[in-house]
Swiss-Prot record:
HAMAP family (UniProt xref): KdsB
Name listed for the protein in its UniProt record: 3-deoxy-manno-octulosonate cytidylyltransferase
SUPFAM superfamilies, per the entry: Nucleotide-diphospho-sugar transferases (SSF53448)
Keywords: Cytoplasm, Lipopolysaccharide biosynthesis, Nucleotidyltransferase, Transferase
This protein's encoding gene: kdsB
Claim: Nucleotidyltransferase is one of the keywords in the record: yes
Length: 243
């Protein structure tokens, strides 16, 4: 099951999930991409998102407005849907309308093999890495996440030295091995790291839970601001979304 948490009043760009992406609302684009891989449900926090999804025949459930993270909203949706404890759950974003089907499939495969949870990352350049909106991740020898940060990591101390490891940009999608894992993560007490960086995935690392990271090729960009949307609409074409 794929669940897309969708919040109307995003702090940096209100109503962004309803913004038009080549003739379809953003959240509908995201759901249509997800439905190419598995059954998808949008976890809404507002009736306007529900109505939009229903208009385009996208399955949706109404959840609380008071969740602290998309993961918590996913869990409520999973409970509403009555998912079995052993069912695999993917958490995709409602602001990634250009996410490729191949990336979702890669996440699904990684989740099958991950004992706790999985996510994806892509190689980025130094200029991209400077943006705090693009989260960076560093990995251990088994491609599990060591840390996620809005800062540039790993930091290259010797500026004239050649970088030995690629810079990896996190793609904010998650796979939980089963619903029980999702339940477990949400019962853990929030930690200071996730509050400092405003990155919910740091809770898992803080409590020594493994996050497997699949490195993928992707041109997708998250839409965090009005400027992001305007830039994305210049870069992408409608033809790329017709799959």
């Amino acid at each position: 099951m794929i669940i897309i948490p969708a919040r109307l009043k995003s702090s940096r760009f209100e109503n962004k999930v309803l913004e038009d992406i080549f003739g379809l609302p953003m959240v509908v684009r995201c759901a249509k991409n997800a439905n190419l891989v598995d059954e998808c449900v949008v976890a809404c926090d507002d009736e306007s998102i529900m109505q939009t999804c229903q208009k385009f025949h996208i399955k949706a459930v109404l959840t609380s407005k008071h969740h602290n993270s998309g993961t918590e909203r996913c869990l409520e949706a999973a409970r509403i849907l009555g998912l079995k404890n052993d069912e695999r759950v993917l958490n995709l974003q409602g602001d990634e309308p250009f996410l490729e089907k191949e990336v979702i499939l890669a996440l699904l495969e990684a989740t099958k093999n991950a004992p706790f949870m999985a996510t994806c990352a892509k190689v980025i350049d130094e200029e991209q890495a400077k943006s705090p909106n693009l989260v960076k991740v560093v990995l251990d020898s088994q491609n599990n996440a060591l840390y996620f940060s809005r800062s540039l990591i790993p930091f290259l101390r010797d500026f004239d030295a050649k970088r030995q490891t690629p810079l990896l940009g996190h793609i904010g999608i998650y796979g939980f091995h089963n619903k029980e894992i999702l339940e477990e993560l949400c019962t853990l007490k929030p930690c200071v790291l996730e509050d400092t960086e405003k990155l919910e995935q740091l809770r898992a690392l803080y409590y020594q839970k493994k996050i497997a990271v699949k490195i993928v090729q992707s041109q997708s960009v998250g839409i965090d601001t009005q400027e992001d949307l305007e830039n994305a609409l210049k870069i992408f074409s409608p033809n790329l979304l017709e799959r």
